[in-house]
């Protein structure tokens, strides 16, 4: 069995070329399995990576340092000039090219190869000498944002080209690239830990080029700030960059930041990661060269152990680059650097370790006293990043460590009270941690100068590793199995396998393979507690990485921790072993064996949850082999977290952990607790609420998704105890509804909201929602607004009328909701706000009416109009059901009222406006019902229906058209309908196109409409309220004349509803546009007051329709409105001009012709000053044909301007015309000439000073046309005389 296991494990040697975490460390199989010859400082293989080189030493002599996909500085230098050659003929051409490049790079919607080519084009410009033009540096500043966006791109090729381009800019421009370098360096640092090697190495190489060529002191804080990054690879690289900076820069560039440099290097010398410490020691050399005094002060401030290690390093390295690559442990190594040296571990006393090394054979017995240190046991956490340390002196000649030197008592060291992190000095002066685990790793270990066993470098997957294969995490460690009857571990050195590197996942790795966390079904090993308060070693985590493997600590000093913590290293080792049950059983037996030998009892299993030994569906193979919910499903074993359902404190500690995998396991344990109905104490609840509050912002997707699942169970179990936390819960969930989440996560948030709504008192929820709505510290997004409003609406359906309280907070919230009905950016918000007002009105009509009465007049107008239309439609839709008592609707009682939103149509199933009357309507006739409605409406109509804006800008109206009623909608019954609406340009919600009535023939009778809760197409006339009331509720409607204004309002509402069907119902929309064109010629002021904004916005949106005839018709309608009501465009001039000019780009001639006609009318309709101010920037910046249309339009406008006004506007007009006169398009040049002629016609010879930039030939041509215009020889159409002239 032992041979079989060894063979299986060693089959995975192919992983020995896995790369380190930052994707840029050399490794090869050859160096991993051979004892290297002693190396001298001059040996190039032994020398550390040259800080300035991205490539570094080649692994195996063939591959680049970063491995497949990596790039180095040589690649960059080749790519600098490996670009298409172009020539620059003028600064203007250069500016145009740079503008196009910026446009492409600033928009990530362009194809990625276009963006990559644009980046290459920048290098082409540099090669062509763009840096010699002054305008280049101005445009380079504008390119900063585009370069940053490219460096953040998801396409590695775009990122690579961006990095090469930045490096080239730095190389060519030097310190002139200071602003760009300062902007791009933070983005480049973000590439360092990237899992794609091409991105990581490109970012590193670009930073090196910037450091070499752009010596700007402002870069120093950017680099030093990353020296304290939470990412280990970023810290390593930052110190490497700092070292390069200290080598390359002059002292005067560093003086301003000397203190920062000293502090950063000091932190680096104390860094938790070994390689970061090595790089920091290198930077000390550079610091000493620049600032010897500060360096001396820094040295004196270090603890003795750090001074010793630094001194040893300085002695052993003749230069910065000669440091041997020894002891490059991973960030998970545990060290006690503060512990003083012990004389027995001195390098001058090699006999102290004689018992560890086999000098003459393969089976030398260890000294009795050296049992605690005489094994080659490798702690997985400590050895995960250990580099092979090269032998020296006698240890070199000793060959490899005799594996047989281990006697059966080796496992006793697991319990040895002296097994602590003793400080030992290696040959580079570092203090090493002595750690032990219960796993025997037999490999090609090497020894240092004291005979200390060393292990090979461990390859680590990068953060965010793309591999999800279980095979990537299989170890090649040779593990000897322990038979059930044996009491010792037998190791045969003859068959000892070579130790390979152990691939290990880093923090954000996607690997959730069963092989990482497998625990045998029959294993009695509990999951170790890491974040327990009693286990202080958890706080000594020496890395800032949050890898799951690193969450378990080695044995601590004094052996004073609990059994579960003591076994953490063992379980940590198991997480990287294969999933075979024989391996796991061997580990379990080994652990029990260690306990027996030290006369300790086995660990007590504290966690025995339900189903521990069952094979139910929860542990079946139905789920993915890589599912994080069943790590060991392939073995049928129960995940360890299933056994932790009793220790609430540990579950909470895991939930609060900074390690995402622990948080996830804590949530799973909490789910089990809740499913077992395990209630939490008040203290536990308080702590869990604090943890959950933080988890709403958890950055890890898996944790957040599981948190939402756990939250639902938590609410259901503890809903009676969480009322104090309800505000946080509800507001955070609503905020999450506005976030960009995956559909599945969004559904979980919605489920949590539904459970919350069902679990807590309605009045408490309502008060919290009102409070949240008016909270001035909150600025909810549009999506959050919709979520809040929909929640209030749904809550109102299940509330009792008594739950609605007319408090000051509620009034403020309702006024806020009323303002949301006018939200210009989102129709969803407008619809939802209108629904909320209707729902609250139906919930408790008297109370809500009183609340409206207390609001300012402006808020009353919008709400009253909306509610009136709702009442009208509700009553209108129920007329068809009044004839039979069987179909007569019954209003909602206080206990079971239904919201109108639940019934899409007001037919026989529809409900009358609730709470207007609480008595039985079964015996009421239609007159009784309408008198009841009248009472409610009269209360609403006590408000003022005209805003101050209407009073200040009265328009002419025909009073005869303001009052009255519509045609009778049924025998003996009037249609409850209001009169025309007052103009209220401050109420854009009344223009909401999406909430208009569904298309119904205007003159159909009876007028039975589909119920639409958002309808507000009509409103109450402000001119004759008493007549209005009579019109609404008098049974004999024939006494009132037909109201044309009302008919027009209805028609417009229906037309707009039809026009909202973009890209659909083409023929119907054509008819609607023709009808709208007819309406533009009628003076229905109230209709236009109410609907103008909606009509305009819809027409402008229709200009983007896919049907050209619709686009052309929309422009024609716009032209007619401009002709008949130009004053209304005062506030929309810029938008209208822009959209009309953009239509000139249309590929269909019919649309372009309509756009030209509309632009011509537009030029004569809007005030000349306003029009010129809009057109001038367009003429200067727009491309053909928009600039042509703008120039023609400006020509027409200038004809309307007085001489004095034109003189004032001339500085704005002339630059665009002079620029256009030089345009490549002849038609643009012609238009500029005619525009200049028009200007001359107004101001005469005062134009000449502004023409100084024109060449002689252009002046000659202009004078010719000016003379023609003066003599009239050009005729009515001067364009006929300029063909070929320009």
From Swiss-Prot:
SUPFAM superfamilies: ARM repeat (SSF48371)
Residue segments, region TOG 1: 66-317
Compositional bias (Low complexity): 322-340, 459-473, 620-634
Gly residues bias (residue ranges): 53-69
UniProt short sequence motif SXIP motif 1, positions renumbered to this chain: 500-503
Annotated region (Disordered), positions in chain: 17-70, 320-350, 355-374, 410-473, 492-566, 606-638, 870-920, 944-990
Chain positions with Phosphothreonine modification: 779
Residue segments, region Interaction with microtubules, MAPRE1 and MAPRE3: 450-565
Domain of life: Eukaryota
Basic and acidic residues bias: start-end ranges: 417-431, 606-616, 947-964
Subcellular location: Cytoplasm, Cytoskeleton; Cytoplasm, Cytoskeleton, Microtubule organizing center, Centrosome; Chromosome, Centromere, Kinetochore; Cytoplasm, Cytoskeleton, Spindle
Major subcellular site: cytoplasm
Region annotation (TOG 2) ranges: 642-873
HEAT repeat spans: 179-214, 215-251, 256-293, 702-739, 764-801, 1046-1083, 1090-1127, 1208-1245
Record PTM: Phosphorylated by GSK3B. Phosphorylation by GSK3B may negatively regulate binding to microtubule lattices in lamella.
Motif SXIP motif 2 in this chain: 523-526
Subunit structure: Interacts with microtubules. Interacts with MAPRE1; probably required for targeting to the growing microtubule plus ends. Interacts with CLIP2, ERC1, MAPRE3, PHLDB2 and RSN. The interaction with ERC1 may be mediated by PHLDB2. Interacts with GCC2; recruits CLASP2 to Golgi membranes. Interacts with MACF1. Interacts with SOGA1 and MTCL1.
Protein name listed in UniProt: CLIP-associating protein 2
């Amino acid at each position: 069995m032992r041979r079989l296991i060894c063979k299986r494990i060693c089959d995975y040697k192919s992983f020995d070329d896995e790369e380190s975490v930052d994707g840029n460390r050399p490794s090869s199989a050859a160096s991993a399995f051979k004892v290297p010859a002693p190396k001298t400082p001059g040996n190039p293989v032994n020398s550390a990576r040259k800080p300035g080189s991205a490539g570094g030493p080649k692994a195996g002599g063939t591959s680049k340092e970063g491995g497949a996909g990596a790039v180095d500085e040589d690649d960059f230098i080749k790519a600098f000039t490996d670009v298409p050659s172009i020539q620059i003929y003028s600064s203007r051409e250069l500016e145009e090219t740079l503008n196009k490049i910026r446009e492409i790079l600033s928009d990530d919607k362009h194809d990625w190869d276009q963006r990559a080519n644009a980046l290459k084009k920048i290098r082409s410009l540099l090669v062509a000498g763009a840096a010699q033009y002054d305008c280049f540096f101005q445009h380079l500043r504008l390119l900063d944002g585009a370069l940053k966006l490219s460096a953040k791109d998801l396409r590695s090729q775009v990122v690579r080209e961006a990095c090469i381009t930045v490096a080239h800019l730095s190389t060519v421009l030097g310190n002139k690239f200071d602003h760009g370098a300062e902007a791009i360096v933070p983005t480049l640092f973000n590439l360092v830990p990237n899992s794609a090697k091409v991105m990581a190495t490109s970012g590193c190489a670009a930073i090196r080029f910037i450091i070499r060529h752009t010596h700007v002191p402002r870069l120093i804080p950017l680099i030093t700030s990353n020296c304290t990054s939470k990412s280990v690879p970023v810290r390593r690289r930052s110190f490497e960059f700092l070292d390069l900076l200290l080598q390359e820069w002059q002292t005067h560039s560093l003086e301003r930041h000397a203190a920062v440099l000293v502090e950063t290097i000091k932190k680096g010398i104390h860094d938790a990661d070994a390689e970061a410490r090595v790089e920091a020691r290198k930077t000390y050399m550079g610091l000493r060269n620049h600032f010897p005094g500060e360096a001396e002060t820094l040295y004196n401030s270090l603890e003795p152990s750090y001074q010793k290690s630094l001194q040893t390093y300085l002695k052993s390295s003749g230069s910065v680059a000669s440091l041997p690559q020894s002891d490059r442990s991973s960030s998970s190594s545990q060290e006690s650097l503060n512990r003083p040296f012990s004389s027995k571990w001195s390098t001058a006393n090699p006999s102290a370790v004689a018992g560890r090394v086999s000098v003459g054979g393969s089976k030398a017995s260890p000294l009795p006293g050296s049992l605690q240190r005489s094994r080659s046991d490798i702690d997985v956490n400590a050895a995960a990043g250990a580099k092979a340390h090269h032998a020296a002196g006698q240890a070199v000649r000793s060959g490899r460590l005799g594996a047989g030197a281990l006697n059966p008592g080796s496992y006793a060291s697991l319990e040895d009270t002296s097994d602590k992190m003793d400080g030992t000095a290696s040959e580079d002066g570092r203090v090493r941690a002595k750690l032990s685990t219960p796993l025997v790793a037999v490999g090609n270990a090497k020894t240092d100068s004291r005979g200390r066993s060393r292990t090979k470098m461990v390859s680590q997957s990068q953060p965010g590793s793309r591999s999800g294969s279980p095979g990537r995490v299989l170890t090649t460690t040779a593990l000897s199995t322990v038979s059930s009857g044996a009491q010792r571990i037998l190791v045969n050195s003859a068959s000892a396998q070579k130790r390979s590197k152990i691939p290990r996942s880093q923090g954000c790795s996607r690997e959730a393979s069963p092989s990482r966390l497998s625990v045998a079904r029959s294993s009695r090993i509990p999951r170790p507690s890491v974040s327990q308060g009693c286990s202080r070693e958890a706080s000594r985590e020496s890395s800032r990485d949050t890898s799951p493997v690193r969450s378990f600590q080695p044995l601590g000093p004094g052996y004073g921790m609990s059994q579960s913590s003591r076994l953490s290293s063992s379980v940590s080792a198991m997480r990287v072993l294969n999933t075979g049950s024989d391996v796991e059983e061997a580990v379990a037996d080994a652990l029990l064996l260690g306990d027996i030998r030290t006369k300790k009892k086995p660990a007590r299993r504290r966690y025995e949850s339900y189903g521990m030994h069952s094979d139910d569906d929860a542990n079946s193979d139905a789920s993915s082999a890589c599912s994080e919910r069943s790590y060991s499903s392939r073995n049928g074993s129960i995940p360890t977290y299933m056994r932790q359902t009793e220790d609430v404190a540990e579950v909470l500690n895991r939930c609060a952990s900074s390690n995402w995998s622990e948080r996830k396991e804590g949530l799973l344990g909490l789910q089990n607790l809740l499913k077992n109905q395990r209630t939490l104490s008040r203290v536990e609840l308080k702590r869990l609420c604090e943890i959950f509050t933080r988890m709403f912002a958890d950055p890890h997707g898996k944790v957040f998704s599981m948190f939402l699942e756990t939250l639902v169970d938590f609410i259901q179990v503890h809903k009676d105890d969480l009322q104090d936390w309800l505000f946080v819960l509800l507001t955070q969930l609503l905020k999450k509804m506005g976030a960009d989440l995956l559909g599945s996560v969004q559904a979980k948030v919605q489920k949590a909201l539904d459970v919350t709504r069902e679990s807590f008192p309605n009045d408490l929820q309502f008060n919290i929602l009102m409070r949240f709505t008016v909270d001035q510290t909150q600025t909810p997004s549009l999506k959050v607004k919709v979520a809040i409003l929909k929640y209030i609406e749904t809550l109102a359906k299940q509330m009792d009328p008594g739950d609605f309280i007319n408090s000051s907070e509620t009034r403020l919230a309702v006024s806020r909701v009323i303002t949301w009905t006018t939200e210009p950016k989102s129709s969803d918000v407008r619809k939802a706000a209108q629904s909320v007002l209707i729902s609250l009105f139906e919930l408790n009509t008297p109370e809500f009416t009183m609340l409206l009465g207390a609001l300012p007049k402006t808020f009353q107008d919008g709400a009253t109009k909306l509610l009136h239309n709702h009442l009208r439609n509700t009553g209108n839709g129920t007329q068809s059901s009044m004839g039979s008592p069987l179909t007569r609707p019954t209003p909602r009682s206080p206990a079971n009222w239904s919201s109108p939103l639940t019934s899409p149509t007001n037919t026989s199933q529809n409900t009358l406006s609730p709470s207007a009357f609480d008595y039985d309507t079964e015996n009421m006739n239609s007159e009784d019902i309408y008198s009841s409605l009248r009472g409610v409406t009269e209360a609403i109509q006590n408000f003022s229906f005209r805003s101050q804006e209407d009073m200040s800008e009265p328009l002419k109206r025909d009073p005869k058209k303001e009052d009255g009623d519509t045609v009778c909608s049924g025998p003996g019954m009037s249609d409850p309908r209001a009169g025309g609406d007052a103009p209220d340009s401050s109420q854009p919600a009344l223009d909401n196109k999406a909430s208009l009535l569904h298309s119904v023939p205007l003159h159909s009778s009876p007028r039975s409409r589909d119920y639409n809760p958002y309808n507000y197409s009509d409103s109450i006339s402000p001119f004759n309220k008493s007549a209005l009331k009579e019109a609404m509720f008098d049974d004999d409607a024939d006494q009132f004349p037909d109201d044309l204004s009302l008919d027009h309002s209805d028609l417009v509402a229906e037309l707009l509803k039809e026009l909202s069907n973009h890209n659909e119902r083409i023929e119907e929309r054509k008819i609607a546009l023709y009808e709208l064109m007819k309406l533009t010629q009628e003076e229905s002021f109230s209709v236009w007051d109410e609907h103008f904004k909606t009509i305009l916005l819809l027409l402008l949106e229709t200009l983007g329709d896919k049907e050209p005839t619709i686009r052309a018709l929309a422009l024609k309608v716009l032209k007619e409105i401009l002709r008949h009501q130009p004053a209304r465009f005062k506030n929309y001039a810029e938008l209208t001009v822009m959209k009309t000019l953009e239509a000139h780009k249309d590929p269909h001639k019919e649309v372009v012709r309509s756009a030209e006609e509309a632009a011509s009318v537009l030029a004569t309709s809007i005030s000349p000053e306003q029009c010129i101010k809009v057109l001038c920037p367009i003429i200067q910046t727009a491309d053909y044909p928009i600039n042509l249309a703008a120039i023609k339009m400006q020509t027409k406008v200038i004809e309307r301007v007085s001489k004095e006004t034109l003189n004032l506007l001339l500085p704005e007009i002339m630059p665009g015309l002079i620029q256009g006169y030089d345009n490549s398009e002849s038609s643009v040049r012609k238009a500029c000439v005619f525009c200049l002629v028009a200007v001359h016609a107004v101001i005469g010879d005062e134009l000449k000073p502004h023409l100084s930039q024109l060449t002689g030939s252009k002046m000659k041509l202009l004078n010719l046309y000016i003379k023609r215009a003066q003599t009239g020889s050009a005729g009515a159409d001067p364009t006929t005389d300029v063909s070929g002239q320009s």
